[in-house]
């Protein structure tokens, strides 16, 4: 046989990426990866490790013990070989903690949202989603094949109107409990009332509420609505619990249905045992050390005061609005140069004109660390502060 014929490529099918890259660069919207060292030298005000549990010795030991007993990987789908007693123990303990009847673990909070929304909807359904819902909820709506209505942020009247005018037999309202970009709270009580007026299911992403609101049990529990039969919670194990993975929590019938119907559960490898063991240990620490959620909120209030943010934080998130993405990038870089790492949110994560520094408070911040934050943030924001007002 002769050498294979070489077919010349007139134009690369990926040539369009060059133009897109230039557009992103010119708009200040390029992203990059920056590996962190095992032990950081900067003050961390960017991670979602709200309770400081990712480095807690009990949490690390929980992961190590699970690794020794069950091995490095789950070895398969939960429906084949990837299920362990550890998975089911954590599901039961998480559900009990937030006041739900049952729980189901997923490999991430992202896949938990995909599994819950897509698995509980489909053609002939209506999904009503807040405009600021997390990207995983947005993608779940897109994959659902349901009709989707996106309502203005925290607008209960718009939700009510969308539900009232529907023709679909089934309807679902979708919201974060704590919105990730600005830390505001969803009007859960009012949303649930609207759902009940129109026979709709309420799906709440408690990723930023678990471990912080309601003494750690989440915003729904704080409002006295835990265990409602027409509410499904999703959450992540990667924020307050300092591990990795996600969960859907709600009625037992929902768990049973998702085992049969949630594609991100059926066709994904089960959550690694070490992540399950670490999350289970973190939940134990959260139950035992009840000061941690209050400390997060107190530190968030202090950070907001430092940054002259007028609104009192309702979560671990403190949002410092700067507007221009280049200004936000420069401010974040200046903070890092001075020893403080902060988040920087730009479009498309947030709407155009609302680029911001996103600070996340942690329960374990010391007085010396708070003083460093005060000094650096005050210095850095002296310039950009005028631009954001």
Curated annotation (Swiss-Prot):
Q: What is the lineage of its organism?
A: Bacteria, Bacillati, Actinomycetota, Actinomycetes, Mycobacteriales
Q: How does it assemble?
A: Homodimer.
Binding residues for substrate: 31, 134, 349
Q: A single Gene Ontology molecular function, please? A: 8-amino-7-oxononanoate synthase activity
Residues where N6-(pyridoxal phosphate)lysine is found? 239
Name the enzyme group at the top EC level. Answer: transferase
Q: Kindly list the residue ranges recorded as spanning the membrane.
A: none
What PROSITE patterns does the annotation carry? AA_TRANSFER_CLASS_2
User: Which keywords annotate this record?
Assistant: Acyltransferase, Biotin biosynthesis, Pyridoxal phosphate, Transferase
Please tell me where pyridoxal 5'-phosphate binds in this chain. 109-110, 180, 205-208, 236-239
Which catalytic reaction applies to this protein? 6-carboxyhexanoyl-[ACP] + L-alanine + H(+) = (8S)-8-amino-7-oxononanoate + holo-[ACP] + CO2
Its cofactor is: pyridoxal 5'-phosphate
Biological process (GO) annotations? biotin biosynthetic process
Check the record and name the Pfam families matching this protein.
Aminotran_1_2
Q: What is this protein called?
A: 8-amino-7-oxononanoate synthase
EC number(s) given by UniProt: 2.3.1.47
Q: Does the keyword Acyltransferase apply?
A: yes
Job description of the protein = Catalyzes the decarboxylative condensation of pimeloyl-[acyl-carrier protein] and L-alanine to produce 8-amino-7-oxononanoate (AON), [acyl-carrier protein], and carbon dioxide.
